[in-house]
Amino acid sequence: METTFDVRGLAKHSPPAMAFADVFSELLKRPTPLMRRFLQLVAEETGGPLETLARQSQQVTRRHFGKTMRLFAPLYVSNECVNNCSYCGFSRDAGIYRTTLTVDQVVTEARHLHGLGFRNILLVAGEHPKFVSEGYLQNCLDALKPFIPTLALEVGPMEDDQYTEIVGHGAEGLVVYQETYHRETYTQLHTAGPKKNFDWRLDCPERAYAGGFRRIGIGALFGLANWKFEALALCAHLEYLYRNCWKAQFTVAFPRMRPYAGNYEYQPDPELYLPDKAFVRLIAIFRLLFPQVGIVVSTREPAPLRDAIATLGVTHMSAGAKTEPGGYTGAGSDDLHLTIKGRRVELQEKSGCEKATEQFQIHDTRSPAEVAAMLRGLNLDPVWKDWDESLLALT
């Protein structure tokens, strides 16, 4: 039985005849050998104790990545959105304080992050063509590229020709989480906007690859559907992408639901929730099955847990993150407003202390310097820069 995914020799593969959305349902009915291996490992009675998996995962990680941890920061540029997603603080019908940063304000935020050491920034925006309009992201990339060498995007899905243009302006990475791979749950949770289209989002990584992206991140938001189903689907998706988009590097993440605007009292459903031990087990399993994949853990997770898993398989961590536009410097706070049915509505009163509403609450509130110190204490080298244009000549 195949126990790991070997990327060697993939250049011989011809382009896929069908997109992942076309084969996904069939894969769930007839799992590949790698998926069957996942199912074996995820159950403790057949996969062995967590301690053994964690030790093996640590060894494989050191072999492929050395004793390093790549650090990045999300930079939210807009919390406007046309989608209604019942689990998201940016949801269209949420009565939140919204703003979209100007390009100059994006630069202000990025220079602040640069001063903290970051050279790897993820630009994040809600999906709203009126506010995050044609050319906006390109202008942001043009302004940041001279001093931020590693730029990635987490924005609404696009056509492959749009991705080609984005890549031409300096973006090298794209992150798109399916949220949930359970089609019925997805339909229930997404009630308005282009995000309603399950297959359009599912095939987004392939369009990004066709558009020229060579660093692609996928994941599911754990807590929306049964965590074992989500993890198996994520395994299937990652295996498909490795086989059919073989020139790209991939990262995978297992973000867990956190309190958010509209539901700050959020409590996880015990029937769906990914508990800590299972979370660590997934990190170890994905490392063993996909030795070359990057594994991302964000500040959604508590500091003690992040410290404990830093050496076990994780390769990328965010640090000091803010999940609202202007969160690092207060940029854009002078333009706060509501958006109702696509129309901007001014606030009736402003105290001067308001800020844009965050997408969700983070858990690890330590500064980037504190996270870096923690990593060094674990004998890991914090890596702030993860890309150089000269590497493009090698692809």
Task: For each feature predicted by the language model, list its residue ranges.
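Auxiliary Fe-S-binding modules of radical SAM enzymes
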Residues: 1-47, 243-395
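An N-cap/entry alpha-helix motif that binds or orients negatively charged groups
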Residues: 32-69
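N-terminal cationic-hydrophobic initiation segments that often serve targeting/anchoring roles
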Residues: 42, 61, 114, 145, ...
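Conserved, mostly hydrophobic/aromatic
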Residues: 57, 85, 123, 176, ...
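Generic structural signal for well-ordered alpha-helices
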Residues: 58, 73, 110, 137-141, ...
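Canonical Radical SAM [4Fe-4S] cluster-binding loop centered on the CxxxCxxC motif
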Residues: 63-105
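Core AdoMet radical
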Residues: 92-107, 113-209, 214-224, 246-253, ...
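Catalytic cores of alpha/beta
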Residues: 159-168, 214, 225-240, 302-312
